Amino acid sequence: MRVLTFRDVAVEFSPEEWECLDSAQQRLYRDVMLENYGNLFSLGLAIFKPDLITYLEQRKEPWNARRQKTVAKHPAGSLHFTAEILLEHDINDSFQKVILRKSGSCDLNTLRLKKDYQRVGNCKGQKSSYNGIHQCLSATRSKTCQYNKCGKAFGLCSIFTEHKKIFSREKCYKCEECGKDCRLSDFTIQKRIHTADRSYKCEECGKACKKFSNLTEHNRVHTGKKPYKCEECGKTFTCSSALTKHKRNHTGDRPYKCEECHKAFRCCSDLTKHKRIHTGEKPYKCKECHKAFRCCSDLTKHKRIHTGEKPYKCNECGKAFMWISALSQHNRIHTGEKPYICEECGKAFTYSSTLISHKRIHMELRPYKCEECGKTFKWFSDLTNHKRIHTGEKPYKCEECGKSFTCSSNLIKHKRIHMEVRPYKCEECGKTFKWFPDLTNHKRIHTGEKPYKCEECGKTFTCSSSLIKHKRSHTGDRPTSAKNVAKPLGGSQTLLNIR
């Protein structure tokens, strides 16, 4: 039995065929060929590096004059291994995964499928290549022969012997990371495994990428170019994979299902991230603060807290942001867009968080509870301010008189005493006020609105303080000090001006 070579599992294209592939299919081809070579290398079958791999590593076209002539002269001489062929003829599950993991459901229409296979099937030499894959992969499961210099194991003694000859002929280089001996031709590849070499760098922000295709996609963040357009809704995307995911919004397709909770996802990466919720795995760790994250994108965002990087810039005002979501929200200030609408009252909001807070007005939901006194609040900020009543903390201090306050809003109001600022102006008569509630009460003089009604006699008033004064005519209550002043029934202000 002859040894399996890279040519047995390679896909070769003529220039005409290569031009028929789009950029995504060309990237897929590069990734699959490099991975196939990597698998042969790990099995000890890649004795020499093929020209095709050299071309792909240098990001050149995967053909030259010699290959072009060979393909033209022998059209059946190059095997066209595709996911469809591998599945149809059941070559081997392990080998199929190498292709399927990269190609997924991609439909490479330009590859010659069944016709080529039928034509190649008549050739005994090519059939032996398929059989060679079977025999090689079956044999490597046991891996009975291991070479102590480099640690590689082999299922076939003939391959093991051939591998030993290579080390006897060539000078070996020892990897400092794992201690393996490598030939010079493979030493760079071995180093990249440990260092995760990122050779493509963005000139705008300095970000490094492993692949040139990743750098091309990243550059679109800066240029704003979105060449991939959805035919359904017209939305555009920077990369083809994002468009593929988006299309599933229209089709409702969720092909990736969690075996634990049966939740389905539109893309495989989302399922992988979701599984970590069940396993508790957090493989991405910050070197600065050692905080761990479930997905790489979360770690990337987190790192900006330490570096201060703000890669997302507003074209209108030049303000920069750490995250693209923050930029998207900021842009609504310029556009006036308010996409979040309350179903109860129809009021629109710029941010989803504001809508969630607003909904509590209709629901009377008070999710934040004080552990000291049991009082509940609609908003967390109100609970935080309330807790300071128990702790006595007053972190907001006036620089003019030294008076301190429990919340920042009270300090802002207090500062107006020193500044004599009256920021609230009546549009009807031009009168100004220090406090917004005073302006609200004043406006009712012009509108005639009297929302505060006495339950005893039915008389109505423009402000809550007037109602409180009136109620005393029924009760006969005459407070003589500020301590005896009752709190307003219809508002949140404390009555301070009654003597």
Swiss-Prot record:
Record family assignment: Belongs to the krueppel C2H2-type zinc-finger protein family.
High-level lineage: Eukaryota, Metazoa, Chordata, Craniata, Vertebrata
Described function: May be involved in transcriptional regulation.
CC annotations in GO: nucleus
Protein name: Zinc finger protein 727
C2H2-type ZnF: 143-167, 200-222, 228-250, 256-278, 284-306, 312-334, 340-362, 368-390, 396-418, 424-446, 452-474
Subcellular locations according to the entry: Nucleus
Organism whose genome encodes this protein: Homo sapiens (Human)
Pfam families for this protein: KRAB (PF01352), zf-C2H2 (PF00096), zf-C2H2_4 (PF13894)
